């Protein structure tokens, strides 16, 4: 079952995509919600600083950190990518520190800087490659540098906006805000 962090942000939109795919899910609002039924986690878009504080005050930080450390699947979108990053280049906070990348918060600026694009997700020789995926950015981050453990999955205008590292999937964009379910399907296959 997929646990969706539901302390702030676009958790309802991720739940709607999983419903569309017939995949079971559970909202994670407090530590007691994270039980043995959770085998994968979604960290949704939203405001990363707020989510970081709420992860600690709800007691969810430790069980999610243990889940990630155990190599179980996790998918971070926008703020979720920030929460997963080993380092932020414009913020001293580090949250889970699991994704071998340096990420820039709010790299695409203010709300008015939000935009849409289309790109492929995955390497050209990857059998799971997703072509022509619609990307929705809302004040999104992007990746400033990628370490050797992570693999670039997609770029827009020369900026890395999608990464994979083992069972970690991270996007600067919001696939849950489109009608295309393929990236969620990829996550469910991990």
Swiss-Prot record:
| InterPro entries membership | Class_I_gatase-like, PdxT/SNO, PdxT/SNO_CS
- The answer to whether UniProt assigns keyword Hydrolase to this entry is yes
- Active-site residues from the entry: 78, 174, 176
Q: Can you cite a GO biological process for this protein? A: pyridoxine metabolic process
Recorded GO MF terms: glutaminase activity; pyridoxal 5'-phosphate synthase (glutamine hydrolysing) activity
- Where along the chain is L-glutamine bound? 46-48, 105, 138-139
Q: Please give the CDD domains that the UniProt record associates with this protein.
A: GATase1_PB
Q: Which PROSITE patterns match?
A: PDXT_SNO_1, PDXT_SNO_2
> What keywords are annotated for this sequence in UniProt?
Glutamine amidotransferase, Hydrolase, Lyase, Pyridoxal phosphate
What EC number(s) has UniProt assigned to this enzyme?
4.3.3.6, 3.5.1.2
**Reactions this protein catalyses:** aldehydo-D-ribose 5-phosphate + D-glyceraldehyde 3-phosphate + L-glutamine = pyridoxal 5'-phosphate + L-glutamate + phosphate + 3 H2O + H(+); L-glutamine + H2O = L-glutamate + NH4(+)
Pfam families tied to this protein: SNO
Q: Which Gene3D superfamilies match?
A: 3.40.50.880
Protein's pathway: Cofactor biosynthesis; pyridoxal 5'-phosphate biosynthesis
Question: What GO cellular-component annotations does this UniProt entry give?
Answer: cytosol; glutaminase complex
Subunit description: In the presence of PdxS, forms a dodecamer of heterodimers. Only shows activity in the heterodimer.
Q: Which family does it belong to?
A: Belongs to the glutaminase PdxT/SNO family.
Briefly state the protein's biological role: Catalyzes the hydrolysis of glutamine to glutamate and ammonia as part of the biosynthesis of pyridoxal 5'-phosphate. The resulting ammonia molecule is channeled to the active site of PdxS.
What's this protein's name? Pyridoxal 5'-phosphate synthase subunit PdxT
